[in-house]
């Protein structure tokens, strides 16, 4: 009898230990406002943003401007406070185009040993400014300067005014370093990083040696569609001009031989990159906070998509990312309803609809450097593709390479949270926010070989040491195709994810400031 009693008591005690904690209550007004988010509201926003009339919201197209106007109008109608004049944060960008005069000449004692125009052996890069570089040619190994990691290819090299010649990829010593993540190693191999280091050392030009230069039409389409056009932010390339190009291993052979003989070579690099200016806008609303309103939490989603391709097909981008934009608009309306009843989080919350994500997170990158309002950003929650079920039928498809095969039927309740290795406090807050919603929140993509953690608008925040997480339901066969349409959205799931994200944003804005974990 005693033994049986003890057993029952132990079972009861163990059950008491492992029983889940009750959901953390939110103030009644915000809890009620969040529960008022409806499928109808989300459907209305996506039906407009992903309509053929907006033609895929591609940057540089009228449909993109119409999306900006629609979103600002929704915020205005919901009485969301403006975080920028008329909700619009202007962002100046440019589209680089290749001119006809691009060339490179490398000389030994005044005699050209390499002379090339655009072709399979030589190609200027979109990272280039339009400045012509003339100066001594200096070989700088991989062109990576990382003295804090014990490696600097510029040691004892005066690169001021020179054209530097660099190997492709990253130095072996950094690739083998246990201190560096796979993401860090990829950074050191990128041409943007080599250009940054070349500019920091005063170089006038950078030529990177590659096995395969690339297709000129692929890099510089003669008649770019909305989908293929590239855009960039004004910045270092114009403040400190640097000519940038790639050259083939084959073409550089005479130069290698001369450098091995320690001959003094000179180079003339004319990238002939023409910057065509354009303006776009981030759309910004906000609610003021309470005791910590000098700090802001940003919840955002990108409004743009791929536009129209060369064949005239429209990429409506219902999941990517009208779904995330609709969620942020619904969250903005919910927080504004609560604020109207006097219920606000401690910190201000900015509701951001970013532009230019498909061209490299241009709007988010600009905002991190120029926040509106000008306050300290303590956290970011990003929503990108939150309206479907992850479905990866063929891991060998280039779009999915590095991901495991999975079927939509196995992911009906799944949402992925990325950024957890950088923002563990936000990841824990997500667990709390999910107690009420009961989604299956997976944290398994921060280290995938596709670098998914870098491929959306939270990444500029993480790059600046700001805790950020990325919510997504994952990839599927309609990703970046004309078949990503409104009819394929799971609106009931999107509604739950919107409520989950809203609760997470409240917890981030009302609790202790989340910490950033350096990798």
Please tell me what each predicted stretch does.
Residues 141-218, 294:
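A conserved hydrophobic secondary-structure block that centers on an alpha-helix together
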Residues 247, 333, 472-519:
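His/Asp/Glu-rich mid-to-C-terminal helical/loop segments that flank catalytic regions of hydrolases
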Residues 28-36, 52-62, 77, 124-128, ...:
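Second-shell loop/turn segments in exported
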Residues 330-360, 375, 383:
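Short helix-loop-beta-strand segments that form the rim/entrance of peptidase-like active sites
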Residues 21-82, 218-219, 287-289, 296, ...:
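N-terminal hydrophobic or amphipathic helices/low-complexity stretches enriched
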């Amino acid at each position: 009898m005693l033994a049986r009693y003890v057993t029952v008591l132990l079972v009861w005690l163990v059950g008491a230990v492992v029983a889940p904690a009750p959901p953390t209550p939110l103030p009644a007004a915000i809890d009620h406002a969040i529960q008022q988010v409806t499928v109808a509201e989300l459907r209305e926003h996506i039906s407009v943003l992903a309509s053929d009339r907006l033609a895929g919201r591609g940057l540089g197209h009228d449909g993109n401007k119409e999306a900006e106007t629609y979103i600002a109008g929704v915020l205005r109608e919901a009485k969301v406070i403006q975080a920028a004049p008329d909700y619009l944060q202007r962002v100046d960008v440019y589209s680089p185009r290749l001119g006809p005069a691009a060339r490179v000449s490398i000389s030994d004692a005044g005699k050209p040993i390499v002379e090339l125009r655009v072709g399979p052996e030589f190609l200027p890069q979109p990272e280039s400014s339009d400045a012509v570089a003339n100066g001594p040619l200096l070989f700088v190994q991989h062109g990576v300067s990382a003295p804090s990691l014990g490696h600097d290819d510029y040691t004892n090299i005066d690169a001021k005014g020179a054209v530097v010649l660099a190997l492709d990829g990253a130095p072996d010593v950094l690739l083998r370093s246990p201190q560096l993540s796979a993401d860090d190693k990829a950074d050191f191999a990128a041409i943007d990083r080599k250009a940054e280091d070349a500019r920091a050392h005063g170089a006038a030009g950078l030529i990177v040696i590659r096995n395969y230069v690339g297709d000129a039409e692929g890099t510089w389409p003669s008649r770019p569609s909305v989908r293929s056009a590239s855009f960039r932010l004004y910045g270092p390339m114009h403040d400190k001009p640097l000519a940038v190009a790639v050259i083939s291993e084959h073409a550089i052979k005479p130069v290698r031989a001369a450098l091995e003989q320690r001959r003094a070579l000179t180079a003339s690099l004319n990238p002939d990159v023409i910057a065509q200016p354009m303006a776009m806008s981030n759309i910004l609303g906000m609610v003021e906070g309470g005791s910590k309103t000098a700090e802001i939490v940003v919840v955002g989603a990108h409004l743009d998509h791929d536009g129209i391709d060369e064949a005239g097909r429209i990429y409506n981008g219902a999941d990517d990312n009208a779904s995330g934009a609709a969620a942020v608009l619904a969250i903005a309306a919910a927080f504004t309803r609560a604020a109207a009843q006097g219920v606000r989080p401690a910190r201000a919350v900015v509701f951001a609809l970013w532009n230019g994500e498909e061209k490299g997170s241009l709007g988010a990158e600009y905002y991190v450097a120029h926040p509106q309002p000008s306050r300290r950003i303590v956290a970011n929650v990003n929503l990108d593709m939150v309206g479907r079920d992850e479905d990866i039928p063929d891991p060998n498809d280039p779009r999915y390479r590095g991901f495991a095969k999975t079927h939509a039927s196995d992911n009906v309740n799944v949402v992925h949270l990325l950024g957890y290795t950088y923002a563990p406090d936000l990841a824990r807050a997500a667990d709390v926010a999910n107690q009420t919603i009961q989604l299956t929140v997976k944290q398994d993509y921060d280290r995938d070989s596709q670098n998914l953690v870098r491929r959306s608008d939270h990444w500029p925040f993480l790059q600046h040491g700001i805790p950020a997480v990325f919510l997504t339901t994952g990839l599927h066969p309609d990703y970046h195709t004309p078949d990503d349409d409104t009819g394929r959205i799971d609106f009931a799931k999107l509604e739950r994810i919107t409520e989950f994200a809203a609760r997470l944003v409240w917890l981030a804005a009302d609790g202790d400031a989340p910490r950033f974990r350096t990798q």
